Amino acid sequence: MSVHHAAYIDYALRVTENMTDVMTGSDTVTLKSYQHFVSRVFLGLDKMHSLLLFHETGVGKTITTVFILKHLKDVYTNWIIILLVKKALVEDPWTYSITKYAPEILKDCIFITYDDKNFHNKFFTNIKTISSRSRLCIIIDECHNFISKSIVKEDGKQRPTKSVYNYLLKNVALHHHKLICLSATPIVNSVKEFIMLVNLLRPKILNNISLFENKRLINESELINKLGAICSYIVTNEFSIFDDVEGSATFAKKNVYFQYVNMTQKQEQVYQKAKSAELKAGTSSFRIYRRMAATFTFDTFLDKTDKTPEEIVNEQVTLYKDFEKFIKTKKFSDHALSHFKKGQSLNGTSSADDISFLNELREHSCKFTDVCLRILASPGKCLVFEPFVNQSGINILLLYFSAFNISYIEFSSRTKNTRVQSVAEFNKRENTNGDLIKTCVFSLSGGEGISFFSINDIFILDMTWNEASLRQIIGRAIRLNSHVLTPEHRRYVYVHFIIARLSNGDPTVDEDLLDIIRNKSKEFTQLFKVFKHTSIEWIYEHQTNFSPVDDESGWGALISRSIDENPTTKRVPRIARGQNIWYSHSNRMITVYKGFKTDDGRLFDSDGNFIQTIQANPVIKIHNNKLVYVLD
């Protein structure tokens, strides 16, 4: 049916043939061709009531959306624009971009923050004040967060955001409104998020069907057939975050490194106590104690058993102050700092005080110490991701920065009032090489909605629970023209995963989380392929043999067909002859996978999904006593 979708896309482009690609307010911007294409299709099809902008970070989905909002009155005269966004993103990029390029629509905009505890009340209060003569255009920025907040919890308790989700699902199409969802990572934690997002865009089209069987998408063709034109897909980097990516004229190259650092004996002892405490408390599945212990440990493990919250806080404050006092009484000599900046270790010419101080810092945190040394040796600016803010997180990391004389800004929940301006200072042209501010340390607050320029090194100190969050984090530093001011030989971003390691070789919490991320991504990759093949770009490029239409009267029926719950096309198991092999997508073999190669050269992953056909003379390397096929 995609050929029919192509006919309507063609119709929309004919209707908007004379639409300008220039947007002017107090400043002027010319849209990229892909931005203009999306805008023309969405505005040219008045009955296209919803669209997902699945655009990777840095390609300008905010500007695309502002352009659409600016031209809504080309379609209908009375619009109220409701922007559902995170608090951190109201000012920049949204208010900033609208004021700069479409100030005339600001009076029609209502900002409602979905991370506000009173979000649903504010939403419905505003809805009641809107005239029935006005059409709504609802924007959901970082829609994966909105969807996640709308999922019913395991205890069955409905979350407040779900009532807004239900309202939009019921009323957008019914009352001829429009909805745009934006995300660089539309699925983050579970397949249920895909189902909820699709049903928001195409109400009740999926129902409660099971999409996977043994981690395989049951009927990919049926989904692609029925979900045509559900999204715009602008993703040039489809590689895993763990793979190297070559640079281009507009994007910096990316190399990934796994930096394994050994815990000291003291840190190992505290780590094992943290593990025991998790088992005792029944919280081992969350791994919080181990994650913190793998990052930093005080002289003693803070046992929370039989203690009041006040006692725990007081003990934490005491431990922090003791460590802070220790840090402030010592400093590295210029000689030591000079060695660190050259990437050199302390040696026989170094003072006993410098060597002792470095060892003491490493005793408490192998990861913080390693990162500080790497920051000093980096030729440019650095980003450091640390999800924990208090206790053993950013609070302590900044003491390490002080010890190593590293200049920094902080972007976290505790710097709400200053962080936007701090990023602006960090991004200034005169700080291209990090001469004024070397590093930005950020928590999950910095994973979305902000951009960094001329970054050379990113350090991931602690894993998130999914690849999507890590992709967002890395994407903040690798954006369109993000390195245009950087010297050509430094137009790269090195991503360092800092992984704590135990002396006995047992897997640490860092390694456990890496495995979880990789397993989740297998299903998500298949769903992202569905989005790609149902995008307006893919359809318009590949479905060219269509009969033109002269109106959009048939659009509604085309997009409202339900997914077949009993697909007729099923996989037929077949036996293939071949051998188990190891393979990698990277020449440097950052990640090595187990697969199966058939006698005729077809490669399948461990779940039976086809990867590619291996060339006649493949590149095979030896890695950790394994023969590894390097895929091109």
UniProtKB/Swiss-Prot annotation:
It is an enzyme of class 3 (hydrolase). Residues 457-524 are annotated as: Binding to the cap-specific mRNA (nucleoside-2'-O-)-methyltransferase. A motif (DEXH box) lies at residues 141-144. Residues 367-532 form the Helicase C-terminal domain. ATP binds at residues 55-62. One of its GO terms (molecular function) is ATP binding. One of its GO terms (biological process) is DNA-templated transcription. SUPFAM superfamilies: P-loop containing nucleoside triphosphate hydrolases. It is found in: Virion. Residues 42-204 form the Helicase ATP-binding domain. The keyword ATP-binding applies. It comes from the Viruses. Coiled coil: none annotated. Monomer. Interacts (via C-terminus) with RAP94 (via N-terminus). Interacts with the cap-specific mRNA (nucleoside-2'-O-)-methyltransferase. Belongs to the helicase family. NPH I subfamily. DNA-dependent ATPase required for providing the needed energy to achieve the termination of early transcripts. Acts in concert with the RAP94 subunit of the virion RNA polymerase and the capping enzyme/VTF to catalyze release of UUUUUNU-containing nascent RNA from the elongation complex. NPH-I must bind ssDNA in order to exhibit ATPase activity. This is Nucleoside triphosphatase I. It comes from Rabbit fibroma virus (strain Kasza). The gene is NPH1.
